[in-house]
């Protein structure tokens, strides 16, 4: 067990010494949890195979699931890719710093442990000033798969330091795209939508298949679920009236079976369904995709702390960031999503 140092960032010059210490720990092969605008990351030196493997151990992550390397700027990309397509440069200029990850051909200096053995590497520059200062202090690309801020206590003893930067502004992981010639393929939806990508890319397509068996995914989220609570999840999408009716039907059946339900719902559906008590988590206003994106993982993890037999959740329509939200909800629910 490690002695984990927890530090709250202030967003001021007072953070400088802490960020330099965190960067030094990364260079020494240690793990550091750090904030971004999307979700928190479990960071390690992305050029150190041993450190990257330590991430898999700490998180219990399959080693064939590629890691995303975070860099402070475009120069950080050029240091680890063998070729930077012109279209990728355009995407960097348009969307960085921001929630867009690019999958590009890698140099041999990037270890297989960071790429799942693929000949490509996933790269991102976060839109978070403290994070970028941390990256500069480290002086190396930082491999940083997602970590839930609400589950910091689970990582104590596994990492050297936790940089607590408060709530993330986006709430779901970055969009991941592969760039080949003039084609951008979305491997994982996120806050940078297909519509936004189409404004600068000649052709945009989506790879929706899930990798199974011994296949190696090109990006995180293509083979394994992101966050999922211990309890099964059932998701309903529709008007507040329709969802509240569906919630009522599930509640009646659960009461007859003696099951305890958890409710992850909008304010309007909670009121219409008349559900109360400690097993209710309100994620925001009905239909507000941005609010659900920010609260989704916090809400799912809430029910690990308040165990239930089944979580009844309310989703949103796809489109915009709603596509990313429903991608995560569908995986958390193992596909149990119903439009009512």
Where are each of the predicted segments found?
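Active-site-adjacent structural elements in enzyme catalytic cores
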Residues: 1-340
């Amino acid at each position: 067990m490690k002695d984990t140092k927890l530090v709250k960032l202030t967003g001021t010059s007072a953070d400088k010494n802490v960020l330099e210490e965190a960067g030094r720990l990364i260079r020494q092969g240690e793990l550091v949890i750090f904030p971004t605008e999307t979700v928190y990351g479990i960071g390690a030196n992305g050029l150190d195979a041993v450190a990257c493997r330590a991430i898999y151990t700490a998180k219990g992550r399959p080693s064939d699931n590629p890691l995303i390397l975070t860099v402070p700027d475009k120069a950080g990309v050029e240091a680890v890719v063998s070729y930077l397509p012109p279209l990728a440069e355009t995407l960097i200029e348009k969307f960085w710093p921001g929630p867009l990850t690019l999958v590009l051909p890698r140099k041999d200096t990037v270890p297989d442990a960071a790429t799942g053995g693929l000949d490509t590497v996933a790269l991102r520059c976060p839109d978070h000033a403290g994070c970028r200062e941390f990256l500069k202090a480290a002086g190396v690309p930082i491999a940083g798969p997602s970590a839930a801020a609400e589950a910091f206590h689970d990582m104590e003893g596994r990492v050297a330091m936790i940089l607590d930067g408060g709530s993330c502004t986006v709430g779901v992981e970055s969009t991941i795209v592969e760039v080949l010639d003039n084609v951008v393929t979305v491997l994982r939806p996120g806050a940078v939508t297909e519509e936004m990508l189409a404004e600068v890319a000649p052709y945009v397509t989506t790879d929706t298949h899930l990798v199974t068996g011994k296949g190696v995914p090109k990006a995180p989220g293509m083979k394994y679920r992101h966050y999922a609570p211990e309890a099964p999840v059932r998701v309903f999408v529709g008007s507040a009236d329709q969802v509240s009716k569906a919630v009522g039907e599930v509640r009646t059946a659960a009461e007859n079976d003696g099951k305890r339900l958890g409710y992850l719902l909008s304010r309007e559906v909670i009121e219409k369904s008349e559900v109360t008590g400690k097993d209710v988590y309100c994620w925001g206003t009905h239909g507000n995709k941005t609010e659900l994106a920010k609260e989704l993982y916090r809400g799912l993890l809430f029910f690990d702390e308040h165990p239930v037999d089944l979580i009844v959740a309310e989703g949103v329509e796809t489109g915009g960031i709603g596509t990313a939200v429903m991608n995560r909800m569908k995986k958390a629910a193992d596909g149990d999503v119903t439009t009512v």
